[in-house]
Amino acid sequence: MGKTLADQITELANKSKVPDFDIEDEQVFEHDSNASGSEASDEDEALQAAHYVQVGRSKLRNKHNVLVEDSKYSGSKGSREALFNSSGEEDGSESDRRGSDSDGGSDSDSDAPEATLSSEQSADESARSDSDSGDSDSDSGSDAGEENSAVAEDADAKRERLSQLVRLETQQAMGKLNAAVQNDALKGYAIMEQSRFFEGAIDVRIKLQKAIAAANQLPLTKQSWESRLDAQDAELLESTCKLLHKVAGKCAELRTTFQNKERINQTEIDYQPSKKRSIDALAEQCHDLDSQLRDYRGAVLHMWSSKVAATSGKTALSSSKFKAINQPANVQVDNQLADMPRLVKRTQLNRRGVVPLGFEEDYKQKRLPLLDSNSAQDGGQEEDADVPANYDPRKKDNNAIDASENPYIFDDEDFYRVLLNDLVDKKILNAQQGSNVQVAIKARSQNKLKKNVDTKASKGRKLNYSVQEPIANYEAPINGGFKWSDEQIDEFFAGLLGQRVNFDERETSEAKDNEEEAIEHDDLRIFG
């Protein structure tokens, strides 16, 4: 069926500018693509370069040529025959064969003109020159290939060396980082152990506080002991002495082992535990251990104090360098222990007013020589600023109490309070840090939960109110226990209004009688 006029018109109207080709038709694409493509490419390049400005040769090209023409880029001169003997020999054999052939031809054809010979020689020379030029090109190409391969190998070797250096530096950095992390972890663990040891020592001191206070009440002289000692007390005293002897031996053994292990002692001490050693021998051994520990302690404190001061930068300021707080820890300890009599005197203050058993009797009998000598010395000495004559921390009026010095008691309550305050502050700080973390975690969890919103309290369906907190330090007036009567209330308000009310009962009864008589004598009668 043929196309209608409308179809033909629409086909002509919608005909595309670029003709459509069937990709399966092989004859459509059979044309000279090279010629047309080259011409089209030339035209395109000409159009693209039409707006270019004509410029001269670049200076970079001249510099590049100068660099390339440098003497270091030129090769060494040599003869081809020396390098390529094999190729020369092959060329010689071929020329011999050709010469023999030409001789045979001359014998057979003697009448040939000399022009043919000259033409053949020229042809042979041209062929040889072509072969020589080809050999030279191949030689130069092989030399360039070898140079390129050598350069590539050098670049690969340098790249491998750089990668090895980078890998080695990375390993060293990781090793240093791991070592630093391990050192920091060890320092933190050591600090935690020191804190635990400090807390344990203060805990022991807290438990011994009651024992020290009770020990100050024990009798001071032998006569007082014998007068108050019975069989049961003697048995308890003997068991306590054995226990104290055992504890002192264990402490001496532990300290000796520790100081030998840590190389604190200059000469290793051979400790042999024995039950026959007296308390005096154990005390002497502890004194020797203390003397050897003192030097080691000073060196360690000085080393770590210097490191801490160097990292904090306090030593850089010349104005604060010589302050007591900025000096090394061992120097501060030595300065505190320099005035030992003053420190001992502070431990002999009777702060709690302790009176040992039999103290009055011993004092009257003059069995306390230390107390008598101290009282005589105090009479001629001036008042000490650290140990006032009238001192009692429990009393507000210290001038009324004479808390004198007693050399037979031991009371380090001031130092004990300092240690206890440090421990309490540390515990409070740790608790606050933990509570802050818990509060942050709780607030974060509350933010994730759904808000508590009453959806039914809109449009006046609920009355919103808040309970007011009670007023602090306020008390409403309280009645004295009696109330006004009705007559008093009426009289009070009547007086406020300027009226007077009479509360006489007889007058009210007479008024009632008069009213009744007036009703009886009334002329109006309704019922008979």
Curated annotation (Swiss-Prot):
Major location (coarse): nucleus
Bias type Acidic residues, positions: 132-146
Top-level taxon: Eukaryota
Signal peptide feature range: none
Entry GO terms, CC: nucleolus; small-subunit processome
InterPro entries reported for this sequence: AATF, AATF/Bfr2, AATF_C
Gene Ontology BP, a term: maturation of SSU-rRNA from tricistronic rRNA transcript (SSU-rRNA, 5.8S rRNA, LSU-rRNA)
Localization: Nucleus, Nucleolus
Pfam families: AATF-Che1, TRAUB
Keyword Nucleotidyltransferase belongs to the record: no
Keyword Nucleus: yes
Keywords of this entry: Nucleus
Homology family: Belongs to the AATF family.
Name of the protein described by the UniProt record: Protein BFR2
The species this protein was found in: Eremothecium gossypii (strain ATCC 10895 / CBS 109.51 / FGSC 9923 / NRRL Y-1056) (Yeast)
